[in-house]
């Protein structure tokens, strides 16, 4: 899977989100997702939301994924 494909999946799953995806090899990915959908949710719940989108791709097309999941307010503060 290429970075732009992963980005598109995440943008579809989280409408209005700001998504940045990087990968040195199209197997190991780093993603930052900023969305209102994360408001009021702890980090673990946010990550589960992302993994639910990826489903069976995790461990296959996506071997490793480093996540940074933020609300818009958290992103502004950083």
What are these regions (language model features)?
Residues 1-17:
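N-proximal, solvent-exposed amphipathic alpha-helical segments enriched in charged/polar residues
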Residues 29-33, 75-78:
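Short, solvent-exposed polar/charged micro-motifs at secondary-structure junctions
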Residues 44-78:
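C-terminal structural segments of small proteins and small subunits
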């Amino acid at each position: 899977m290429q970075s732009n494909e992963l980005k598109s999946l995440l943008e579809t799953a989280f409408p209005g989100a700001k998504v940045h995806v990087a990968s040195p090899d199209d197997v190991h990915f780093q993603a930052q997702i900023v969305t209102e959908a994360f408001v009021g949710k702890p980090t673990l719940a946010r990550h589960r939301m992302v993994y639910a989108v990826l489903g069976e791709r995790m461990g296959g097309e996506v071997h490793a994924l480093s996540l940074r999941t933020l609300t818009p307010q958290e992103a502004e503060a950083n």
